[in-house]
C-alpha cells in the first residue's frame, strides 16, 4: 500500500493549478479546498491516516489508490504534452493543444472521483423523500410561482426516472398553489434533492400586474428524508388520530364521508394531515408517511447539531427561512446564493431537466468539499 501516493497527487496538482478543476463550473471565489490546500500539512496527515489505517476506508482504499495512480499518470502525460507546444511543427502543436484539452478534462474527472471517495456518504443519501411547497410573500403571484416550482420538481422526478406521488394539493383561485406535498422515490433521490430546501424568490411582472411593474414574491421548499422501519419506530400510543369531512375539491364524496385524517404526535406536537384521497385508509397512510418524515427530519437535525460545532457546513444545515435562490425573469437568470452560481435560460431551467440537474450537481460538489474541510478539521 502506498498512502503517500494520494498526497503526492494532490500536492502536485495544487502546485500547478491552485484550485480544484472539478470546481471550475462553480462561481466561487473562496472554495474551502483552497483553504485546505493552503494548510498542506493537515491534508497530508489526513490522507496518510485515511489511506493507511482508517477502517472506514478499508473498502474504498484500493479504489482510492487506483484512481490516484491514474491521476498521477495523467498529470505526467499533461506535462510531457505541454512541451510540444513549443515545437516548430505547426501540426504537432495543434495536436498537442487537443491532447492538453482532453487531459485536463480527464484530470478534472479523476480529481472529482478522489474527493467523492474521501467524503463518506450520509445515512440518508439513499432514502426517498417528502417534498413540501408553500406559498410565501406575494399573494396570488407567490401561489402561481409555487405551482411552477412544484411542476418543475415533478418534471425533474420524471427526468431522473423517480416515482412521484402527490400527497396534498391546495390550489388557489386563479390556478396557483397554496400548499402541496409529494412523495418522491428512486435512486439516491434524497441525495440529489436535499439542497433544494429553503426560500425560493421570484422577480418578474405578475400576470395580475396591469402597470408592468416588477414584483418580488417568495415560496418555501421543504425536503424531508423518508425513514425506513429500522430508522424510526413510532409508538402507536403516542399518536392521536382524528377524522373529519374533507373540504375543497374532491367530487361527490366531499363533505359526505369522514375521509380527511389528522394525526398528532403527542410527545412533539407535530401534526400531519391529508384529505387528498376519497379513501380514509389511503389518507391515513399518506398522513403517516408525512409524519414519519417530519419526525425523522427532527431526529436528524438533533444528531447534526451534536455532530457539528462552531464551524458549520454552509450547505444543508441552514433553516428553511434561508433565501437560497432567485429566479429573475427580466434578466432570464437563476442564481443560487449559496455557491454564487448563475444560469441563464429560465424557461429551460423551469422544465426541470438538464439545467436544474447541473445546478444540483454543483451544490453536491460544493457540499462535498465543505464536508472534507470539516472532516479534516476534526481528524487532524
Curated annotation (Swiss-Prot):
A motif (GGQ) lies at residues 250-252. Transmembrane segments: none annotated. Residues 63-118 form a coiled coil. GO terms for cellular component: mitochondrion. One of its GO terms (molecular function) is translation release factor activity. Methylation of glutamine in the GGQ triplet by HEMK1 is conserved from bacteria to mammals. Residues 1-25 form a transit peptide. It comes from the Eukaryota. It holds the Pfam family RF-1. It is found in: Mitochondrion. Residues 236-300 are annotated as: GGQ domain. The modification N5-methylglutamine is found at residue 252. The keyword RNA-binding does not apply. Its main location: mitochondrion. Keywords: Coiled coil, Methylation, Mitochondrion, Protein biosynthesis, Transit peptide. NCBIfam families: PRK00591.1 (NF001859). Mitochondrial peptide chain release factor that directs the termination of translation in response to the peptide chain termination codons UAA and UAG. Belongs to the prokaryotic/mitochondrial release factor family. This is Peptide chain release factor 1-like, mitochondrial. The lineage of its organism: Eukaryota, Metazoa, Chordata, Craniata, Vertebrata.
Amino acid at each position: 500500500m502506498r498512502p503517500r501516493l494520494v498526497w503526492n497527487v494532490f500536492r502536485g496538482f495544487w502546485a500547478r493549478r491552485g484550485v480544484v478543476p472539478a470546481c471550475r463550473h462553480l462561481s466561487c471565489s473562496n472554495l474551502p479546498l483552497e483553504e485546505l490546500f493552503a494548510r498542506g500539512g493537515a491534508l497530508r496527515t489526513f490522507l496518510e491516516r485515511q489511506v493507511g489505517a482508517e477502517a472506514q476506508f478499508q473498502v474504498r482504499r484500493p479504489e482510492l489508490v487506483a484512481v490516484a495512480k491514474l491521476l498521477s499518470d495523467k498529470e505526467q502525460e499533461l506535462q510531457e504534452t505541454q512541451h510540444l507546444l513549443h515545437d516548430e511543427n505547426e501540426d504537432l502543436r495543434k495536436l498537442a493543444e487537443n491532447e492538453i484539452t482532453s487531459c485536463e478534462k480527464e484530470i478534472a474527472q479523476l480529481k472529482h472521483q478522489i474527493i467523492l471517495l474521501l467524503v463518506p456518504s450520509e445515512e440518508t443519501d439513499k432514502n426517498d423523500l417528502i417534498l413540501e411547497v408553500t406559498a410565501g410573500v406575494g399573494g396570488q403571484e407567490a401561489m402561481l410561482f409555487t405551482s411552477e416550482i412544484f411542476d418543475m420538481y415533478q418534471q425533474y422526478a420524471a427526468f431522473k426516472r423517480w416515482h412521484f406521488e402527490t400527497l396534498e394539493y391546495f390550489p388557489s383561485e386563479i390556478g396557483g398553489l397554496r400548499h402541496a406535498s409529494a412523495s418522491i422515490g428512486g435512486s439516491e433521490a434524497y441525495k440529489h434533492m436535499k439542497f433544494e430546501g429553503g426560500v425560493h424568490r421570484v422577480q418578474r411582472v405578475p400576470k395580475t400586474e396591469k402597470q408592468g411593474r416588477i414584483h418580488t414574491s417568495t415560496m418555501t421548499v421543504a425536503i424531508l428524508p423518508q425513514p425506513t422501519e429500522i430508522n424510526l419506530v413510532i409508538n402507536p400510543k403516542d399518536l392521536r388520530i382524528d377524522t373529519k369531512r374533507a373540504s375543497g375539491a374532491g367530487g361527490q364524496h366531499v363533505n359526505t364521508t369522514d375521509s380527511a385524517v389528522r394525526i398528532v404526535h403527542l410527545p412533539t406536537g407535530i401534526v400531519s394531515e391529508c384529505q387528498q384521497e376519497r379513501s380514509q385508509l389511503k389518507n391515513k397512510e399518506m398522513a403517516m408517511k408525512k409524519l414519519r418524515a417530519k419526525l425523522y427530519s427532527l431526529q436528524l437535525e438533533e444528531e447534526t447539531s451534536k455532530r457539528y460545532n462552531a464551524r458549520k457546513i454552509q450547505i444543508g444545515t441552514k433553516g428553511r427561512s434561508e433565501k437560497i435562490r432567485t429566479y429573475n425573469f427580466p434578466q432570464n437568470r437563476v442564481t443560487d446564493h449559496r455557491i454564487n452560481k448563475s444560469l441563464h435560460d429560465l424557461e429551460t431551467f423551469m422544465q426541470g431537466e438538464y439545467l436544474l440537474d447541473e445546478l444540483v450537481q454543483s451544490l453536491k460538489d460544493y457540499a462535498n468539499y465543505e464536508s472534507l474541510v470539516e472532516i479534516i478539521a476534526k481528524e487532524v
